[in-house]
Amino acid sequence: MSTRAKVAVLRTKPESVLEDYRRLLKLADADRFLAPGKTTILKDNISWHYPMPSANTTPWQLEGTILGLHDLGYNDLSCVQNKTVVIDTYKGEDLNQYVPIFRKCGLPVLYNFKESDMKWVPFEPKVKMLALDRIYPKGLRIPDYFFGKNIVHLPTVKCHIYTTTTGAMKNAFGGLLSTHRHYTHTLIHETLVDLLAIQKEIHTGVFAVMDGTTVGDGQGPRTLKPVVKNVILASGDQVAIDAVSAKLMGFDPMGIKYIRLAHEAGLGVGDPKEIELAGDDVSGESWGFDVGWNFHRVMGWLSWYGPTRFLQKLLFHTPIVYFPIFVSETYHDRIRWPLKERKIYEQWKRDTAWGRLFTEYQQKGCLLI
């Protein structure tokens, strides 16, 4: 694309983070991208129901974004949650300290898996799909609640075993696709591009606010190595904010397939040379992150990309799917969390300023609302 995109980036600290988020939304021109007078959906990111640093939307990110939207006149807000076969949504919003914020500001919380909240309706995109029409040959269904509303994504800066990085574009995955979305993993990059095209059709505005106060290196989106980086980002260009995040982590954004494909499709700007950075200068930063390998990534590679991928339909489209779900749950929740990641979380709470702020949220619920 020839039009330059704008991504706002601010350095922050716990003492000022809520005010910094309010300033960030203004700096990123949120009111240019979100239609006035429309309900604005907040789509948080629960990659793991446990409060693993860098894996999930932070409570200060949620509270700061709500405050910033209120400042700009967006008072009709809601939150939409989704579930996966391995994540407990209710546990996640509780342990990650979202519930007190929802309650304090009277924010309606809806669940895309509850028929009383929304229904999955047939949808035929106007633009040609790269993958979803092949993955769902009987037709695509998306939640009816999403039509005609703004959406603000709340991802974090982190690596991902399937997509190298994950951020604004990947955050649409849980909201727009059903619990069968694991069918898309072989074509995950193309799927993310399709989802961005769909968002541009159904939403009155799309915006992203990304937390990089503690960022995630390694085998994300759950078993990460948290690193304190003290940055927050926002943009109305979902491709550009993911590109800036990827560059900060040390990756070539145009070398990441979903970013390159979206750039080439004209859905946003993925080339850092065509992105304007507003706020604090982070153009020289490169953190040298590396996704690396673990048991879960090896199993995922064999399932979706390796020589055994021909077994996909047997493994994931039949009741046999409950076995890999059990393996994943056992590995993450019964082995990794108690033996390793919980200790990392407790050390982060004890030894970092952001961990101590998280403790303050546990004690107070919210800070300014």
Q: Where do the model's predicted regions map?
A:
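N-terminal and secondary-structure boundary signal
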Residues: 1-369
